[in-house]
Amino acid sequence: MRPLTPRQAEILELIKRNIADTGMPPTRAEIATRLGFKSANAAEEHLKALAKKGCIEIMPGTSRGIRLTAEVEEVTETGLPLIGQVAAGEPILAQEHVEQYYQVDPSMFHPAADFLLRVKGDSMKNIGILEGDLLAVHKVQQARNGQVVVARVDDDVTVKRFEKKGNVVYLHAENEDYSPIKVDLGYQSLTIEGLAVGVIRNGDWL
């Protein structure tokens, strides 16, 4: 199966969820409404692209004429995992943290993404990372000053700009309403979970 754009991956996930929840695929109008398209025709164009990439089959003459291909059904749990609520003390990529998978090519990011994290809050809004965005993350354990990281501080996961001075780490927000998080490595726990390598907003690249 050819790599999908984030918007195509979002539509494919919507189709999968609708089939799982209701037993049938969504109509073009339903896709347009849920994803904010101006018309069902816009949804139709994306469906044609998914068909060309071998993800779905379109059956003409019916509003719900969408069928997942066998290849897509076999790879439901592949692609980039979207990480939801992270339990204290558990690895961030533990299976129980995965909400769903997006069929997005990891190599479209540089370095390649290992997982997606849904952004909560507006502490990084000044650099275009907004609440509800999907942050593409490259898994690493160390960071350089100035990099935007996903960090775990005493089991709280946060996205901030990294700065280390001696034995103290400052996690800086990109929003003047938030003060830096100071982490004294002498007695506090800090784990770097990865580097931010891209953002998906409403299914579009930024």
Curated annotation (Swiss-Prot):
Record site: Cleavage: A88, G89
Active site: S123, K160
Broad enzyme group: hydrolase
Keyword Repressor belongs to the record: yes
GO biological process: DNA repair; DNA replication; negative regulation of DNA-templated transcription; proteolysis; SOS response
InterPro entries named among the record's database cross-references: LexA, LexA-like, LexA/Signal_pep-like_sf, LexA_DNA-bd_dom, LexA_repressor, Peptidase_S24_LexA, Peptidase_S24_S26A/B/C, WH-like_DNA-bd_sf
UniProt catalytic activity: Hydrolysis of Ala-|-Gly bond in repressor LexA
EC number(s) given by UniProt: 3.4.21.88
Pfam families: LexA_DNA_bind, Peptidase_S24
Record keywords, A-Z: Autocatalytic cleavage, DNA damage, DNA repair, DNA replication, DNA-binding, Hydrolase, Repressor, SOS response, Transcription, Transcription regulation
Any one Gene Ontology molecular-function term assigned to this protein's record: DNA binding
The keyword Signal belongs to this UniProt entry's keyword annotation: no
Superkingdom of origin: Bacteria
DNA-binding region: 28-48
Similarity section: Belongs to the peptidase S24 family.
Protein task: Represses a number of genes involved in the response to DNA damage (SOS response), including recA and lexA. In the presence of single-stranded DNA, RecA interacts with LexA causing an autocatalytic cleavage which disrupts the DNA-binding part of LexA, leading to derepression of the SOS regulon and eventually DNA repair.
Subunit structure of this chain's protein: Homodimer.
PANTHER family in UniProt: LEXA REPRESSOR, LEXA REPRESSOR-RELATED
UniProt protein name: LexA repressor
Gene behind the chain: lexA
